Amino acid sequence: TRVVPALYKTANGLKQEVQVIIDHQGTVTQAEVVFNGQEQKIQLTDGQNICSFELDEVKNEQQMPLSVSYAGTTHQSSVTVEPVRHWQVNMVQHTHTDIGYTRSQMEILAEHLRYIDYALDYCDATDNYPDYAKFRWTCEIAWAVSEYLKCRPAEQIARLKKRVKEGRIELATMYLNFDELPDEQTLAASLYPLKQFREAGLRAEVAMQNDVNGIGWCFSEYFADAGVKYVNMGTHGHRALICFDKPTVFWWESPSGKKVLAYRAEHYMHGNFWGIETNDFERFETRVLDYLDQMEAKDYPFDIVAAQHSGYFTDNAPPSTRSCEMVKRWNEKYGWPKIRTAVASELFKEVETKYADKIQTIRGAWPDWWTDGFASGAREAAISRVTHSNVIADQGGLSL
């Protein structure tokens, strides 16, 4: 049996579904299924057969009787039906910046600048949507935003400021998604756009490291000093072991004892694996509910989860309002779980406020798994390392 982790809306209030799943082999057989006084007749065919029963919302755990009769035999048991957990799923849309994956940085920069323009237009286009379905977008890296502030007209900058202030667009603080090649000085210098953002009156308090399964420990020090409160790690398990068996929120402690709140998220396009950008509602529905079942089985401690996604299922993808339509359709059907569009920092703030006593502290480095890839550009890696060394030497000489 499966108690579906959802409450759906009907004219008679919220209802929940219990599925009786019967695996059958052999010839077609007539069966009678009786669950909690409700009776259904079903033809059992080869494979999995599902009988669905509707219940009023259960407020307390209950044992409900079940019997299945076929071929002259009756099997009886009981089903534990618990109240449906009141989940909230935050859909966090971003564009994943992957230099070289589709084209070089000089070619993709113009696209990423246009994506910010698109995001502003999509905010305008969904202003009249229900709040949970309004377009929201997180600028994953600071590089494109920094360049945007240098080249766009004042009216566009004003539009961006307005949407950032409203919480419809969020600026993240990492210049790019860094591997382990840059040294500490380079990583410190990479946070320079924070000064630019703050001089422009733009809030930026979350770092996003996507598609890299580690991050320099020095960042936990730098972020704390720079007023960056949150670190969102959008993982990618290809040829890698991802830390923890489920999404995990923890205080990441620096070598000196400073802390930032970190979230080991799922894959940085987890929502695309669900089909958030498609028009296939049934597929999306099935995968979301299956995922919440998995989180329940893994004892996930919070009632809120976040799923990152892009407008289309690829890196360097433009934003899209398709997810807004999917979220709107979901909430028209379901009372729980609730799904909403969100920016990255919203999950952190919710967890920090409601579950402070459940957040562990971890002190340690977070190394990446994909350092074997450096050999693919051995000449460039060597030039980079020599340049880093020379910069350190030159700075030392200049300081004298």
Model-flagged regions — what are they?
Residues 1-400:
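Catalytic-domain carbohydrate-binding cleft regions of carbohydrate-active enzymes
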